[in-house]
Regions:
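Serine endopeptidase catalytic core focused on the charge-relay Asp
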Residues: 2
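Flexible, gly/ser-rich surface segments that form the specificity/activation loops bordering the active-site cleft
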Residues: 10
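Soluble, non-transmembrane domains of envelope/secretory-pathway proteins that act on or interact
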Residues: 7, 24-149
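Surface-exposed, Gly/Pro/Thr- and Asp/Glu-enriched linker/hinge segments
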Residues: 16-25
């Protein structure tokens, strides 16, 4: 579940500048208060890379020096030189997990002709006939897919 969330950072979030690499990537950007540090942690199915940008004596890096602007380009340069597309295997889906194409605005299984979809991982016990269920009280939740994480 965490991997699919972090894949979303690359597909739709602050790591989207990596999408065009066409690799199976997941990651997270970070920026501290007052932009004194910026970082990006990213991974493939067999490699983890962390990039930190900051100073020994904390000083602001600059107003717009965020994880996606300062650290992500360094990650990109490294991953372009070290990972071949043929080496980038898909992430394995853990046992007892189900991948489902959902509409992110409703959390429900996407209809066949839906244009706005994402793939999310759910505990298999929380999926019944294509519907995602609360694990606590076994009722259908259509409002917040994040309740399953």
């Amino acid at each position: 579940q965490v991997t699919t969330i972090l894949e979303g950072v690359i597909k739709r979030g602050t790591g989207k500048k990596l999408r065009d690499l066409q690799l199976n990537l997941a990651g997270k950007t970070g920026t501290t208060n007052e932009n004194t540090d910026a970082w990006f942690i990213g991974f493939t199915s067999n490699l983890v890379i962390g990039v930190y940008v900051g100073m020994d004596n904390p000083k602001p890096l600059g107003k717009f020096e965020t994880g996606s602007k300062a650290a992500l380009p360094i990650f990109r340069e490294f991953i372009e030189k070290s990972v071949k597309k043929s080496d980038a295997r898909p992430f394995k889906v853990p046992e007892k997990m189900t991948l489902m194409v959902v509409d992110p605005s409703t959390g429900e299984k996407a209809k066949f002709n839906s244009k706005n979809t994402i793939i999310e991982a759910y505990k298999s016990k929380n999926v019944l006939n294509g519907k995602v269920l609360y694990s606590d009280n076994n009722r259908i939740d259509t409002n917040n897919i994040l309740k399953f994480y």
